[in-house]
């Protein structure tokens, strides 16, 4: 029995020694031994082979009855505006048949609206050999099945223990390091050590995700005293960005593991955590942000203006609060490659631990980060217009769909004002067309 215990201790020590020597230490120093690159090369070749096998295995492709206009689309929509579509049926006056237009739009929204589908995982064009994404894919060949089984063994018996070890090291180092640094008096030494801890631990955590991050246009990286705004897909967005530079973060208070990390990191760095439902918290956040931006020696602030996680196919409405405090805005676009793993956090379905387990049993996290030129509020431009301009720039750069809807619809009911807006538009159309119809022949309305 003692021999088994000694063997287990020896194996554990050997395992940790290899992890520290080959992964943790190089990550902390910001160097790579080429292990991640070799793994990604093998993974890409395997998925390419699997895609070819799947395409060959489809003997009789099913006829496509409907054109799919966008990702995750299952119905064909007519995007003609209300006024043009109804005017094409008749002119000027109300007709009972107009009801059918609104009924059709209602049925389309029930079957597939453009908002709620952004809160579920993106559908893949080709299967990536993960069980959780094989809804639309079926048995093709024995060879492909064998490769899938080998993949399951590799992911759960080798990658999961390795990633769990790295995550435990990274999170523990983050909590302990920031707690210790937080005891130091405010000053340049504390700020320097805080940046070292955040940067080092973020690099280890990226390795725990088998992360391959491509940073573009580094000359546009956020500067001190500025505000960095980015589209939001997952809590790991912050790790992805901190892997290349440190930020003072602003975000919602969380419980559980996330809460422990938040309470530890705020001791060493001026992060701002708040409760969105508390009005006094929001006023306090605005005040803190103004003070932070006024000091050009402080770290740039990292804000996700959508306020919730979106599935990385679109960018939804930016809250205007981040754009009211002044200062220079540094937009950042983040785009994940779903072929290697789904980075989206469906917080209404999975807690943070379940989400991390799904991430750690995926193949890898691959994403592109684009630093964009700084933007400032134009003269005569209000906060909402400025927010929309920044959102449009991020959507274009990341190849994402731009949606005007509030991400808060993920949990809240649709406001009555949205329904009333459709009624107002229809009423205005009837009044305008009716006025035009009452004009004498040969005249035009203004």
From Swiss-Prot:
Membrane association type: Multi-pass membrane protein
Entry's EC annotation: 2.3.1.15, 2.3.1.51
Catalytic activity: sn-glycerol 3-phosphate + an acyl-CoA = a 1-acyl-sn-glycero-3-phosphate + CoA; a 1-acyl-sn-glycero-3-phosphate + an acyl-CoA = a 1,2-diacyl-sn-glycero-3-phosphate + CoA; dodecanoyl-CoA + sn-glycerol 3-phosphate = 1-dodecanoyl-sn-glycerol 3-phosphate + CoA; sn-glycerol 3-phosphate + hexadecanoyl-CoA = 1-hexadecanoyl-sn-glycero-3-phosphate + CoA
Entry's Gene Ontology molecular function annotations: 1-acylglycerol-3-phosphate O-acyltransferase activity; glycerol-3-phosphate O-acyltransferase activity
SMART domains: PlsC
Chain location of the short sequence motif HXXXXD motif per the record: 232-237
Localization (cell): Endoplasmic reticulum membrane
Keyword set, alphabetical order: Acyltransferase, Endoplasmic reticulum, Lipid biosynthesis, Lipid metabolism, Membrane, Phospholipid biosynthesis, Phospholipid metabolism, Transferase, Transmembrane, Transmembrane helix
Transmembrane stretches, start-end: 25-45, 142-162, 164-184, 352-372
InterPro entries: LPCAT1-like, Plipid/glycerol_acylTrfase
Pathway, per record: Glycerolipid metabolism; triacylglycerol biosynthesis; Phospholipid metabolism; CDP-diacylglycerol biosynthesis; CDP-diacylglycerol from sn-glycerol 3-phosphate: step 1/3
A GO CC annotation given for this chain: endoplasmic reticulum membrane
EC primary class: transferase
Family the UniProt entry places it in: Belongs to the 1-acyl-sn-glycerol-3-phosphate acyltransferase family.
The protein's role, per its UniProt record: Converts glycerol-3-phosphate to 1-acyl-sn-glycerol-3-phosphate (lysophosphatidic acid or LPA) by incorporating an acyl moiety at the sn-1 position of the glycerol backbone. Also converts LPA into 1,2-diacyl-sn-glycerol-3-phosphate (phosphatidic acid or PA) by incorporating an acyl moiety at the sn-2 position of the glycerol backbone. Protects cells against lipotoxicity.
Domain notes: The HXXXXD motif is essential for acyltransferase activity and may constitute the binding site for the phosphate moiety of the glycerol-3-phosphate.
Protein name from the UniProt record: Glycerol-3-phosphate acyltransferase 3
Native organism: Gallus gallus
GN (gene name): GPAT3
């Amino acid at each position: 029995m003692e021999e088994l215990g000694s063997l287990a201790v020896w194996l554990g020590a050997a395992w940790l020694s290899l992890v520290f020597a080959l992964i943790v230490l190089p990550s902390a120093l910001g160097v790579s031994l080429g292990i991640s690159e070799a793994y990604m090369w093998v993974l890409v070749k395997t998925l390419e082979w699997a895609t070819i096998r799947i395409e060959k295995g489809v003997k009789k492709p099913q006829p496509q009855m409907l054109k799919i206009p966008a990702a995750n689309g299952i119905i064909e929509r007519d995007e003609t505006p209300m006024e043009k579509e109804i005017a094409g049926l008749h002119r000027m006056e109300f007709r009972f048949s107009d009801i059918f237009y609104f009924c059709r739009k209602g049925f389309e929204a029930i079957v597939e609206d453009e908002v709620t589908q952004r809160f579920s995982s993106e559908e893949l064009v080709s299967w990536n050999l993960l069980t959780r994404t094989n809804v639309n894919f079926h048995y093709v060949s024995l060879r492909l099945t064998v490769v899938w089984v080998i993949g399951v063994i590799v992911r759960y018996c080798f990658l999961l223990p390795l990633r769990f070890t790295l995550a435990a090291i990274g999170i523990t180092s983050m909590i302990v390091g920031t707690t210790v640094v937080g005891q130091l008096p405010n000053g340049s030494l504390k700020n320097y050590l805080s940046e070292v801890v955040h940067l080092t631990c973020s690099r280890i955590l990226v390795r725990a995700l088998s992360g391959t991050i491509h940073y573009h246009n580094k000359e546009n990286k956020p500067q001190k005293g500025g505000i960095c705004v980015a589209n939001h897909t997952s809590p790991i967005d912050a790790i992805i960005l901190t892997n290349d530079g440190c930020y003072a973060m602003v975000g919602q208070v969380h419980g559980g593991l996330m809460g422990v990390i938040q309470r530890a990191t705020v001791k060493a760095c001026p992060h701002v955590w708040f409760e969105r439902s508390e009005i006094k918290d929001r006023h306090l956040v605005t005040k803190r942000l103004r003070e932070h931006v006024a000091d050009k020696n402080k770290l740039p602030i990292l804000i996700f203006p959508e306020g919730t996680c979106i599935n990385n196919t679109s960018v939804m409405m930016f809250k205007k609060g981040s754009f009211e405090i002044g200062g220079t805005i540094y937009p950042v676009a983040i785009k994940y490659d779903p072929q290697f793993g789904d980075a989206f956090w469906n917080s209404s379905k999975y807690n943070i631990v379940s989400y991390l387990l799904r991430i750690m049993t995926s193949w890898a996290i691959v994403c592109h980060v684009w630093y964009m030129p700084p933007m400032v509020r134009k003269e005569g431009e209000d906060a909402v217009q400025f927010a929309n301009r920044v959102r449009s720039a991020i959507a274009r750069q990341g190849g994402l769909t731009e949606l005007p809807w509030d991400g808060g619809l993920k949990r809240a009911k649709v406001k009555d004002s949205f329904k009333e807006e459709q009624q107002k538009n229809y009423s205005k159309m009837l009044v305008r067309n009716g006025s035009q119809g009452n004009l004498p022949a040969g005249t035009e309305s203004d």
